[in-house]
Amino acid sequence: MPGLYEKGHFDLAGFSVGVVERNKLLPKQNIEKGDLLIGLPSNGLHSNGYSLVRNIMNQKNINVSLPMSDKSGETIVENLLRPTKIYVKEILELLKNSDGIKAISNITGGGITENLPRIFPNSNIGAKINLSSWKRPSIFNWLQELGNIDDQEILK
């Protein structure tokens, strides 16, 4: 990651692998117009967009120990370093209690606009998303304003 690791530094990462019965594999091919799309709330940046964040912070010379402008009482650094929410408990509970779930999309780098289409069985299927139907974590609003980021880019 340019600008982050110096010679002799390293990154430690991990992953997990799951096992599922073939008949329970997702996405299913029966996704169709009119299906309901449900989103689980993010608690912040998770692990995405930090190259952009670093650029904004460096350009604007931001003191990360200052409080956020959202009156939450949290500092900028507390927002930026908030641990990634892991959704496995919620997802497993949903899958256990409903046989109507046709797909799950992991919204990572690329955001909603690049990840959601991966679950659709063909290009005739799409999604209408009302962006005002949920409260976006304040760190996104703050970064968008500070970095003059357009609406499409902030969705990534």
Model-derived segments and their meaning:
Residues M1-S51:
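Glycine-rich anion-binding loops of enzyme active sites
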Residues G18-E21, P41-S47, R54-M57, T84, ...:
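Glycine-rich beta-alpha junction loops
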Residues Y5-L12, N63-S65, S69-L81, K85-K156:
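Glycine-/charge-enriched secondary-structure boundary and capping motifs
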Residues D11-L12, K28-E32, G49, N55-N58, ...:
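Generic alpha-helical propensity signal that fires on short helical segments
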Residues I31-E78:
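Acidic, glycine-rich loop-and-beta core segments that form the ion-binding/anion-interacting portion
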